[in-house]
Amino acid sequence: AEFNVPILADLPGARELSLNAATRHSDYDTFGTTLNSKFGFKWKPIDSLLICGTWAEGFRAPTIADLYSGGSQSFDFFTDPCDSVYGAARTNPAVRARCAAALPAGVNAANFRQQQQGFTPTTAASSQTPLAFVSGSNDQLTPETSTSKTLGFVWSPGFIQNFNMSLDWWEIRVENTIISDTANLILNDCYINDIAARCSAFTRDPVTGIVNNLKRTGINAGYREVEGFDLDVSYRLPTDRFGNFSAQWTSTYTSRDDLVTTKNAVTHPNPRTGVGWAGYAFRVRSNLNLGWEMGDFGASWTVRYFSGMKEACLSAVTFPEECNLPNYASPNNQG
């Protein structure tokens, strides 16, 4: 059900004021019922300015594939935190102590080496396991729930025809985030984040100490929370003799992007803003497009900008100087 309620119109300070409310009831055989609502407002104090905001709940059930697609084997690339050359144990005493407790009695944690294909010591920060790991679905997944908030404005000044500018603030928090687990996440949670429950997802060879069995599935992470701003500026200039010119600049600034990969309450969020991770969370993304049209002809020029990023390199403890990228711009010409 959805309701749009006009409150005021054509008054000084309120050319338009309206409220919006919507709610949806869903019934799932696997998860029961859920009720999710959304509320919003629009306020136009003057003809050239529109202010709007929303608050909404969200719900996403796991797909059939997430729950029941079965399993398969794969030879994953990963970094063992206990590796004495590339792992976090090299420089982190707490990780080194946890590794010493987990490795077989005959293996010296100070000299332990992860093994790659061919059962030889790894020669890179991320190496392929010589033993197959198991990946697949998870019939214990539960639905994601979310809360989102937005607030913004659109400005279309009368003294500049065909000019529009909008700025929006947004914040989204997703609980029980469904993510694809990885060998790195599991091992890092066990040894670096000291989450004991995650250590049960794998075993080590009783003689060599290498990871000989690991199962990864989709999991419900603790939460993901993102916050940022969207800016959109556009202008069109029509002419009688030279065609129509246009310009549009869109930018997104991510002020916060936190991820907790476990429901463990004491785990601190992993701040992803400006740090390369799955999906690469650039702090700033920007696009500028210039266009021209005349009759059957047209041309456009686009440039994309991504702000500088520090990569969450798997070997950051060993090679920190290799974990940075400069600002990046990519032009695109079309005609």
Predicted features and spans:
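Hydrophobic, lipid-facing positions within transmembrane beta-strands of outer-membrane proteins
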Residues: A1-F3, L35-F41, L49, S137, ...
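Surface-exposed extracellular loop regions of Gram-negative outer-membrane beta-barrel proteins
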Residues: A1-K44, S146-G152
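Transmembrane beta-barrel domains of outer membrane proteins
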Residues: E2-P6, A22, G40-K44, T142, ...
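Transmembrane beta-strands of outer-membrane beta-barrel pores
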Residues: I7, T23-D29, W55-A61, Y68-G70, ...
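Short loop/turn motifs that connect adjacent beta-strands in outer-membrane beta-barrel proteins
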Residues: L8-L17, S48, A89-R98, G106-N108, ...
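Extracellular loop and loop/strand-boundary signature of outer-membrane beta-barrel proteins
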Residues: A22-D27, G136-D139, K215-N220, H268-W277, ...
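Outer-membrane beta-barrel signature, preferentially recognizing the C-terminal barrel domain
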Residues: A65-M165, L214-F229, Y280-R283
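Gram-negative outer-membrane beta-barrel transporters
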Residues: N162-L314
